[in-house]
Each structure stands twice: as C-alpha cells, then as structure tokens.
Amino acid sequence: MVLPRTVRELADLALIGTVADVAPITGENRSIARLGLEQLRSGSRPGLAALLERAGLARDRLTLDNIGFAIAPRLNAAGRVGEAARAATLLLTADPAEAVALADEIEQANLHRREVTRRALIEARDALGLGPPLDPGAGPETAGAGGGTDADARNGLDAATAPTAAAAAAPAAGDVVAAPELPAALVIRGDWPVGIIGLIAGRLAEDFGRPAIVATTLDAESGTLRASCRSGAGVNLAEALIDCSDLLVRHGGHSAAAGFDIEASRWPEFEARFLRIAAERVGATAPAELTVDLVVPADEVDYDLLREIGLLDPCGVGNPAPNLAVTGFTVVRARAANGGHTQLVLRRSRDVVDGVAFRRPDLAGMLNEGDRIDVLARAGSRRFGGFESIQLEVVDVAAQGDQPATHRRPPVG
C-alpha cells in the first residue's frame, strides 16, 4: 500500500506523541513508530534536526528511547516552565535559523525545568520524611517521572535495543524504602509550578513503589488546587478517584496516571479517604516480574546477535526489547557515575565489555574486582570517537551460576 504523502510527512510528529504518551508500540502504533523514525532520520524538519543536535543524538541511529528520554522532555519543558507555543513553533518552522534559535531557547527551558524539579523533589521528600534522593535529578519523563539526568545518560547507549520506558519505571533497588516504613500512598500539597507536579509524583511513585499524589495551587483567588497522580503497588488510580469524585471539581486519567482539581477546603478529607482506599488496595496486583527471554554465554554477545535483536525493532511499551541473562563475566571495575548510575567493565574470555546500570548506585558498592557474575541486561552498541563497541544496559546481577532472573516470558501466539 502506498501511503499518502502527508501521512509520511507527519509521521515524525505522530511518533513523538505516541512515545511521549507511553502508548504501546503494537498494531498501528508500531507502524507509526517505524514510519516516524524514518521521517526523523531524514532530517526534513529543521526544528527537530536542531533539537536532535542539542541533545547530542545522531539521526541515523535514533531509537524510540532517544525520543522518550531526550526529545519529548525537551519539547514538554517549553510548556512546563515557559510557553508551549515555542515548542509548536519549533516543530512547524521551515527556517533553519529560526529553528536553531528556538532549539537553544528550549534547551535552556529544559535545563531550568530540571533544576526546578530537582529542588521540588527534595522539598517533597523532606516534607514526607523520606530523606534526600540518591539521585535528585528528574527521572525519565516517559515513565511518568520527568526527563533529566537519566535522559541524558541514556543518550550514551545507542543500542539496537535501547532501554525501554517501561524498564525505567521499575523501582531503583538502591532507592526503594522497605514497604513497612511507608504509608499506603504518598500524598502531598506544596507550592510548586503546576507544570512539574506530574514529574514529582512520577518520581516519588517510581522510587518508592507507592501511588503518589502531588498538589499545588491552581487559582489562589478561588482556592482551587490541581493535583497529579502516578500509580504504584497495584492501585488503579481511575477507580480510586471515582471513589473520591464527590470531593473533586473534576478528574480524569487512567489506571497508571491521573489528575484532578479540588477545592482547598476539601483537601484534608480527600487525603484521608485516598490513604484509606490505597491501604485497602496496595498489592492487589502482583508486582511486575523481571523476565528472561534468552540465556546466552558472555562470549556469544556479538554483533550478529545485535543484528538479530534489531529485527524486533522498534521496541517499546508492549513490545519490549529482549532481556538477556548473560552468563560468565568477571568484574574488572564497578564505579558510581553521575546521576545515581553504576558504570561497569566486565571481562569475558576474549575481551572486556562495558555496561551501565541506570538508577542502580547500589551496585558500585556491591561489586568488587574479580567477582564472577551473571547479569540480566539488554544488549546494544555504543559509538564513540568513530569506534563502535558492544555495551550492556544492566538491570540486575547475581553470583555466577545463580541467574538474576529465571522466569521466562511466555511466547507470543
């Protein structure tokens, strides 16, 4: 079937919206993703070409996660801390000079958004008695948290199967507080910009595995608050808000993310009721389980394997990149990196392989030189200084012979 010219011309914009909304990359959306990547790689839209340059991304190696962790957060930043119309103008302009100027403006807005969110997250955690975050930077926006430190770090992993937004939403092992120490939900009201409360809620839910609600003043004169919600621990937010609807001015969303307006005078009653509802429903759904798609010896992770994995692209929510249990590594080095990550150098029989464990600062203290380990990882490649090398995005580790995860994903169909 020959697609109309306008469909192909607009596919890049449809792709960005699809990925930013964490829509499943299946069916029509998978076609949108494939066509959108082709259009983005063509460089036909000056605004996006300029934004890719600011993000340090090569057009010919773009992945969906580059969109979700680097491009979408930058476009969203214009509306969160500035004027959303600037992002629209960037996408529509045909003037390369205007595109460069707007991309610079949006890049500054994104840096400002990251700093505002960083400070707000520290304030929110302090008010909830949770202590400072191990990584106070804003987390992945497509996971409902907010593009920031993770977003830029992940640009360095230019993988055939880059890390998925769904994987980024999993709680970071080094930062999660044991369940008995936490309330059933994290509910807080503060004085923050409306545009970032969803980022704060997402990061709290991500770090602590509990539903999080963050509210701020929408209209001081009328006493109206606006709140953003992100789910955790199996709580269906849409259902929970229906059970509180008599207290709300309006509400909307789905099971994992929602929002509402409420009169400030009704906030205490809402908070008490929502905490009660959450206490009844926390854990009603079993937590997500890490899965293994393939067990492979370390020496067999090569470019032939990457090419085979690449046939599954584009990968994303609903069509995740394969998890590999890679066996037979020896630790050469494990060191903490900026943003709460751990960088790894792992030896196999013929050479060494680089790895990065996003939001796993605990691994830097757990692993020692000479440790023999197996890893749960996604395999990709990294291009630096004109050279390409294999790199692993490490999700979990275990002592050699004790695989980090043994539950296999059921075959499709």
Label each residue range with its predicted role.
Residues 76, 309, 377:
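A residue-level signal for conserved active-site and pocket-lining positions in enzyme catalytic cores
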Residues 5-265:
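Hydrophobic helix-and-loop "lid/oligomerization" segment in the mid-to-C-terminal part
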Residues 292-355:
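Accessory interdomain/linker segments of ATP-dependent helicases and helicase-like nucleic-acid enzymes
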Residues 266-271, 363-364, 369-409:
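OB-fold single-stranded nucleic acid-binding module
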